[in-house]
Amino acid sequence: MEEMSLLNHSGGPVTRSRIKHDLADLGLKDGDVVIFHTRMSAIGYVAGGTQTIIGALLDVVGARGTLMVPCGWNNAPPYDFLDWPRDWQDALRAEHPAYDPDLSEADYNNGRLPEALPRWPGAIRSRHPDASFAALGPAAAELMAEHPWDHPHGPDTPLARLIAHSGRVLLLGAPLDTMTLLHHAEALADVRSKRFVTYEQPILVNGQRVWRQFRDIDSEEGAFDYSTVRRGVEPFEAIARDMLSAGIGRQGRVGAADSYLFDAGPVFNFAINWIEAKLKR
């Protein structure tokens, strides 16, 4: 949207103090460990952009709180490059840069905040190339440490540690289907029809570029056959809406954006039960 459209959408500039007030009204509080997903255009004209949003979040969670975002890697080799002609594969392998937590851009599909937060002084980004997260705050080092190479959405991952920290999930204008924590439920759900992918990406090992194979749930095409979900509704949105109907989560407005705040533990428990009840066959 153009600036005036955004200003009209939000009824004037959305300032740091306004965001702080709205976040507090939604239920975010001092000491929270929170993963957040943001669609900035839904909020309106944010005066100061990503810096303002991060600043307001830090104001609310305080010195004891920790912020977390899903990053990924925007310029990762495609999963299917092994289907390319051999000389193309060889050229890619020879020169594709390794994933570097300090330099590699976050996936553009995740919005502007996952690119901004890792640049914040003191932020830490996890080591996994395809499923990296970043965190800022006193719990950041523990959340990001030794992100497992295989099954990066499963046990002993940043998502699992978020739950262990009694963390929360915040959607700032982002659609309900962007809730990355639901991949953790997919990874741990006991359903035989679960889909996995195996892929190769370059990483840094002792400063040297090394190609490594990884295994994960298929988070791109879908970890399960979700065909029972109503046509036109994303599976994660269906889970989240059922969750809200069950009384899990709070809804409010941040700027002009419909926003949601959930406790991570109940989200995980509800989602894993939902998946196993509806998809186990």
Swiss-Prot record:
The gene is aacC9. InterPro entries: Amioglycoside_AcTrfase, Antibiotic_NAT-like. The keyword Cytoplasm does not apply. The keyword Transferase applies. Pfam families: Antibiotic_NAT. It catalyses: a 2-deoxystreptamine antibiotic + acetyl-CoA = an N(3)-acetyl-2-deoxystreptamine antibiotic + CoA + H(+). Disulfide bonds: none annotated. Its EC number is 2.3.1.81. It is an enzyme of class 2 (transferase). Resistance to neomycin. It comes from the Bacteria. This is Aminoglycoside N(3)-acetyltransferase IX. One of its GO terms (biological process) is response to antibiotic. Belongs to the antibiotic N-acetyltransferase family. Keywords: Acyltransferase, Antibiotic resistance, Transferase. GO terms for molecular function: aminoglycoside 3-N-acetyltransferase activity.
